[in-house]
């Protein structure tokens, strides 16, 4: 509001500020505002502040943007404080139910989301019907920019989290009398898999 935006907060802690443009088509600038212990002072919040500053500068210069700007501050991206994660993201996408207000709790205090926010209804900030795009400024959480001597870069790929599970079954036997060629120990096999994974990843440039 201090930046001249029409602001609101929903039941899931999502904060949105809107600056009308020449078109109802909306460009979203945002990030998450929660962080983790030792996450650094710029984790997430820098992207929200950058969006606010862009909108504020446009107002100060008397410029009406071509598109409506929505500055979005997303809650619980880290999934640390509460028992469920991505509350804001799920809320704006319409993928969370009202029962979450009582189901989701603070991991330390045990308070429900309803108690934490003091809200009675599960109102959520929705994505605009006409969305031009989503822009997020974020500090790099790796060494690449520093290594290459750059101060800024555009992200072309986002890492996807994929969990794989292997069950390696061995055969129990007497360790002092079973020759190595007759053993079926699972740990050496696991070691081979662990050793092969980095080489597999290195086949793809810039893989992490």
Language-model region placement:
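Midchain, well-structured core segments that form catalytic/ion-binding scaffolds
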Residues: 76-77, 81-208
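A generic, well-ordered mixed alpha/beta core segment in the N-terminal half of proteins
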Residues: 37-105
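Acidic/His- and Gly-rich active-site-bordering loop/insert found
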Residues: 1-40, 58
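General small-molecule cofactor/ligand-binding pocket signal
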Residues: 8, 72, 122
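Glycine- and acidic-rich phosphate- and metal-coordinating loops
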Residues: 27-32, 70-74, 167-169
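Residues at alpha-helix termini
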Residues: 3, 61, 116-117
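Alpha-helix N-cap/helix-initiation motif
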Residues: 36-44, 179-186
């Amino acid at each position: 509001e201090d930046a001249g935006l029409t602001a609101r907060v929903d039941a899931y802690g999502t904060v949105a500020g809107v600056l009308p443009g020449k078109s109802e088509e909306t460009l979203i600038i945002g990030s998450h505002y929660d962080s983790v212990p030792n996450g650094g002072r710029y984790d997430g919040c820098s992207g929200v502040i950058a969006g606010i500053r862009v909108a504020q500068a446009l107002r100060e210069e008397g410029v009406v943007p071509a598109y409506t700007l929505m500055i979005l501050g997303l809650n619980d991206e880290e999934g640390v404080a509460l028992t469920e994660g991505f509350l804001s993201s799920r809320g704006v996408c319409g993928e969370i139910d009202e029962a979450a207000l009582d189901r989701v709790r603070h991991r330390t205090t045990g308070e429900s989301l309803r108690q934490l926010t003091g809200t009675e209804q599960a109102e959520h900030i929705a994505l605009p019907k006409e969305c031009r795009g989503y822009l997020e400024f974020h500090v790099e959480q790796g060494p690449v920019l520093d290594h290459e001597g750059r101060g800024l870069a555009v992200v072309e790929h986002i890492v996807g989290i994929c969990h794989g599970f292997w069950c390696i079954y061995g055969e129990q036997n007497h360790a002092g009398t079973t020759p190595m060629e007759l053993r079926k120990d699972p740990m050496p096999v696991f070691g081979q898999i662990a050793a092969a994974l980095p080489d597999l990843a290195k086949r793809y440039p810039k893989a992490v």
